[in-house]
């Protein structure tokens, strides 16, 4: 399956390498300690209360001056983790993996080198910003920003690089860009 030919063509091994490192990144996410600053009434705690209210079917709870102080994007991300029965860390790592894959896929129309694409994917997958304490290790809305930035830029780059192609090839990238930007706006 992954046996190199005499020419040392390793392109058949690349999907296995990608899968191995993606699983490794997800497993690493399970071992990363996460923290929440529960005393931050209008930051961390509010986002978790909003997620709980969404789960309870109360939308964003009782309406007061702080109901719309934060966007609904992060509570929806927490709700998605709950509904999919996935640990938060796994969903966060999957967001980073999907963002990395989409970014490489967006560039693939112009950049055909499979080794370079694999290297870029791995660099984005293990990006230091996606593992730092102040951003992703805190259970706060900033944790999903690195992955969502990749998704948003992937959609824009993918659409731009395919502007000469038929509409059928552009449409998935246009939809991705629209949905990603709408969700990204709600992270605020």
Residue ranges and their predicted role:
Residues 1-30:
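Start-transfer (signal-anchor) and selected internal transmembrane alpha helices
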Residues 16, 103-129, 146-147:
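Transmembrane-helix signature of polytopic, membrane-embedded enzymes
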Residues 24-45:
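Helix-to-loop transition at the C-terminal end of transmembrane segments
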Residues 46-54, 60, 64-86, 93:
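Short hydrophobic/aromatic helix or loop-helix immediately within or flanking a transmembrane segment
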Residues 69, 91-95, 129-157, 183-187:
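Multi-pass, polyprenyl lipid-linked donor-dependent membrane glycosyltransferases
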Residues 88-113, 151, 155:
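Transmembrane-helix motifs of polytopic, lipid-linked glycan transferases
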Residues 152-172:
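Membrane-interface transmembrane helices that cradle and orient dolichyl/undecaprenyl
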Residues 172-188:
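Membrane-interface alpha helices of multi-pass inner-membrane proteins
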């Amino acid at each position: 399956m992954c046996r190199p030919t005499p020419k040392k063509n390793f392109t058949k091994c690349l999907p296995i390498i990608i899968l191995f490192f993606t699983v490794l990144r997800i497993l690493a996410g399970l071992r990363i300690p996460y923290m929440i600053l529960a005393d931050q009434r209008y930051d961390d705690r509010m986002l978790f209360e909003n997620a709980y209210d969404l789960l309870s079917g109360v939308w964003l709870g009782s309406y007061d001056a702080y109901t719309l102080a934060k966007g609904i994007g992060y509570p929806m991300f927490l709700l998605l983790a709950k509904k999919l029965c996935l640990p938060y860390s796994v969903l966060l790592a999957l967001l980073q993996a999907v963002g990395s894959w989409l970014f490489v896929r967006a560039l693939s129309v112009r950049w055909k080198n499979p080794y370079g694409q694999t290297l870029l994917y791995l660099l984005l997958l293990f990006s230091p910003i996606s593992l730092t304490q102040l951003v992703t290790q805190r259970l706060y809305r900033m944790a999903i920003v690195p992955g969502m930035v990749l998704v948003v830029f992937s959609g824009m780059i993918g659409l731009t690089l395919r502007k000469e192609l038929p509409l059928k090839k552009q449409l998935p990238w246009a939809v991705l860009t629209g949905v990603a930007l709408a969700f990204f706006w709600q992270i605020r």
